[in-house]
UniProtKB/Swiss-Prot annotation:
GO cellular-component term (any): plasma membrane-derived thylakoid membrane
Main location per the UniProt record: membrane
Protein name: ATP synthase subunit b
InterPro entries: ATP_synth_b/b'su_bac/chlpt
Subcellular location: Cellular thylakoid membrane
Species lineage: Bacteria, Bacillati, Cyanobacteriota, Cyanophyceae, Nostocales
Keywords noted in UniProt: ATP synthesis, CF(0), Hydrogen ion transport, Ion transport, Membrane, Thylakoid, Transmembrane, Transmembrane helix, Transport
Keyword Disulfide bond appears in the UniProt entry: no
Organism name: Nostoc sp. (strain PCC 7120 / SAG 25.82 / UTEX 2576)
Amino acid sequence: MGTFLLLMAEASAVGGELAEGGAEGGFGLNTNILDTNLINLAIIITVLFVFGRKVLGNTLKTRRENIETAIKNAEQRAADAAKQLKEAQQKLEQAQAEAERIKKSAQDNAQTAGQAIIAQAAVDIERLQEAGAADLNAELDRAIAQLRQRVVALALQKVESELQGGISEDAQKTLIDRSIAQLGGGV
């Protein structure tokens, strides 16, 4: 601080000498830096203080409001994002539960359908076995009937051949006696 005052004093002395020389000639240059600078600084500081305070205050106020608004917007967006995330997680959980339910239902349906198919196959096999047995019995009955017809036909054929060959006398006599006995007469 002492150095500053010393410089001011020397500048004043030099400036005073120059000013005196300028006053003699009519026009002079005030080289007293401290005098001129102090006045200029006082004017600038006053202007800055009076007008700059308002401008700077308004600028800072606007800047603060912008920052506060940006912070509020960011907080609101963060809250909205958190809410949307929570909703999305709930929807995901619901979708996973629904998928699990559908999967279990499909497995149950597949198992039920498989059991139904197996049961139907067993019924079909039983029906086919019964139909096969019925067909076999029908074929057996038809074969037996054909054999009977064949036996009867062969017996008739034999009888006819014997009848055409004639009956022996003893057989004719026995036949006649039997017929008379049946009619009620006796021989």
